Amino acid sequence: MNGLRSIAPELPFAIEYIEIQEEEQRFSCESFQLEAFKVQHSIPCFGYKITIPRSGKFSVERAREAGIPVSCWNRLQHGEAVEYEGSLFTPDMVMGEARRGISVVYCTDTRPIPRIAEKAKDVDLFICEGMYGEEDKLSNAKKHKHMTMEEAAILGLEAQPREMWLTHYSPS
């Protein structure tokens, strides 16, 4: 936080932050979960996995069969129970099973380590550094604790994300 305050001492909005103390730490917010995991760099760095859970699909058919007025549907879709003209309608009456959530892993400033592929396993989007494009830059990647594009691609093969983006690359 001190680093941020040195470049932006006064911000026009509040910042809530939690300093990460562990190798891995999980946080839950209202609409998503965040996992921070330590990666291998010359200074403390973390990768992040963000997961947004998704509720089940709303069943119009079940709502109609239960006689639920259309005016109640939106609140039921958002997980609220609704009382209407003496009847109580609950989300479980009209919502299907929870669907697979949306997940993203973001990881830069690191050497390739197994933990990265584990966290990125089957995610929707894996954003990973590929600092060096040429094979002869491997020694630079090791020295500066970064990855080559080939090393990042190998992590991608292990993780099998639905999509992968390489970023943080060097023009040299």
Residue ranges and their predicted role:
Residues 21-166:
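Metal-dependent phosphodiesterase/nuclease catalytic metal-binding core
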Residues 1-19, 53:
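Active-site HxH/HxHxD metal-binding segment of metal-dependent hydrolases
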Residues 1, 18, 161-172:
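Divalent metal-dependent hydrolysis catalytic cores, especially in the metallo-beta-lactamase
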